[in-house]
UniProtKB/Swiss-Prot annotation:
GO terms for cellular component: extracellular space. It is found in: Secreted. Pfam families: IL4. The lineage of its organism: Eukaryota, Metazoa, Chordata, Craniata, Vertebrata. Disulfide bonds join C27-C151, C48-C89, C70-C123. Transmembrane segments: none annotated. GO terms for biological process: B cell activation; immune response; interleukin-4-mediated signaling pathway; negative regulation of apoptotic process; negative regulation of inflammatory response; negative regulation of osteoclast differentiation; positive regulation of B cell proliferation; positive regulation of isotype switching to IgE isotypes. Glycans are attached at N62. Its main location: secreted. GO terms for molecular function: cytokine activity; growth factor activity; interleukin-4 receptor binding. Participates in at least several B-cell activation processes as well as of other cell types. It is a costimulator of DNA-synthesis. It induces the expression of class II MHC molecules on resting B-cells. It enhances both secretion and cell surface expression of IgE and IgG1. It also regulates the expression of the low affinity Fc receptor for IgE (CD23) on both lymphocytes and monocytes. Positively regulates IL31RA expression in macrophages. Stimulates autophagy in dendritic cells by interfering with mTORC1 signaling and through the induction of RUFY4. Residues 1-24 form the signal peptide. InterPro entries: 4_helix_cytokine-like_core, IL-4, IL-4/IL-13, IL-4/IL-13_CS. This is Interleukin-4.
Amino acid sequence: MGLTSQLLPPLFFLLACAGNFVHGHKCDITLQEIIKTLNSLTEQKTLCTKLTITDILAASKNTTEKETFCRAATVLRQFYSHHEKDTRCLGATAQQFHRHKQLIRFLKRLDRNLWGLAGLNSCPVKEANQSTLENFLERLKTIMREKYSKCSS
């Protein structure tokens, strides 16, 4: 019995430390993946990046960070679901078609990572200002870089 009571405090300490390490490590990995995806997306110049998207980032002053990430994921999902087979985005050449498919794949990856970071099941998105997908992704990249600098320091 005495041995068990002596082992409990160190075990709790190890569990607490491991949980903090994993959480911080996950934060870094997820943010790195999001930033990497955003870098790839913003380098691409496709027909779809000039189309408009609901700009939830412009009106995110009274929302939590998790709500912002959730809403960003929601509008990205709405965008790629609507434009996945959009003939304006597919282009006339095989290269344009390939770039469009790559864009959709990156948007889906970004959506999945933002949902994971948000940790919410759903979030309402009100119609707000419109922005091009290109500008939306640039602003989201700035937000993620700021979060990464805070997370890693």
